[in-house]
Amino acid sequence: MHNRWHLYNELIDSVPSTELVKSFVYGDHWLMVESDAGGVGIAQHFPAMPGAQDPALSQYEIMGQPLRKVAERLKSWDFNQASIGLAALNAANNTLALRPESPIQPGVNRLPGNAFDFFRAEATGKKVAVIGHFPGLRMLRQHCDMCILERNPQPGDLPDAAAEYVLPEQDIVFVTGTTFINKTITRLLELTRTAKVFMVGPSTPMHPLLFRHGFASLSGLVVENAAGVARALKNNDCEAIFANGGLKVNLLPGGAQ
């Protein structure tokens, strides 16, 4: 029987066993984990589930803990704990300064402006699905046949249950790192085997092993100034993440193209 956790286990195993959690920052929409090796990762989080622990209190549990052990929370069904796990995973991988020898180094392109604009030429004239309703899709939508799948649909969106029917017909599919948190990523990859799958957003794990699982591109965040990004998260200013030390990056198979 296929192990549904295989991709998760591979990512968690990629986290160095020697690194520890140095700091934890919790905002209204995003959280941040910093390792004692200098790596920083962020992830989106969600309203606490009924009866679940307040995720803001997790700092008292994870400070000084092995980064890999905290990354194991990515498999939790408490989605806020899973967000903490994803941020820990990203702290190990989404960094240029910490691992200059990493495959991430030659594969990174700086992405000015809207990340979706980077894919405009690729998407022109194609059937495109986006998992989740995001700002900045207006320009891209003018160049392709786009459908948006959303758990809480806005006018013109499709409900997320439509994925089983529409994703196998798409040329390009955009997903975010939150699909790791809510455990939909495994099924989404099964439904998109004939499409190009791009993972986008600050929660994206920038690890090349994802290319073996069907991803064509990874667009995420590298934190160059931990203090600046921490201030933005505490002030609940998502746009300020990118103005205060968050660098948009893109990783392609085999390096920059």
Language model: regions and residue ranges:
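Electropositive, gly/pro-rich neighborhoods at or near active sites that engage anionic ligands
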Residues: 1-132, 233-235, 249-257
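C-terminal functional extensions of proteins
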Residues: 197-257
